[in-house]
């Protein structure tokens, strides 16, 4: 078995380099023809690691307090906005999500209220939330955020997909796994056709299985 090194704390200079890499990646996406980019601050990846108490043990300006743990996400967003424009930039979070062993701590929703308020000042194109059921928090975000709000509720049944839009809790509802399993998802929904069931065993596997082999309607 290959030995996995223990992660170490980035220096502040290295943090600046990583922020610059986000900026360069955004520029590259636009030059390649993308309409915009979504900054991935969810699912246990680097931005959420800065936000989370059990992975961010820093004692400098990027750790400790709510403001400190939020700083990296805000600086990444500012760098991307400066490079490609706010109208081309969205950001995604998964408040209280625990993927990859993440634990954001007891004050996580207070932290997100602060973070979202600060990001709102940048007038990003949208905020994309994975929502895990704290309805008051979602209502609070709706008040804090002035631009488009996208909401994904993992595991929500198809007949409930539109409820957040219907109840003015979101502008857009996003779908993940169902779309992976149904390359013609929109057509199936419009026509009432049955959906392919996602194969969870292949979601993170290599090869075409679960990637390009789901059947079309015709």
Locations of regions flagged by a protein language model:
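Flavin-dependent oxidoreductase catalytic cores
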Residues: 1-218
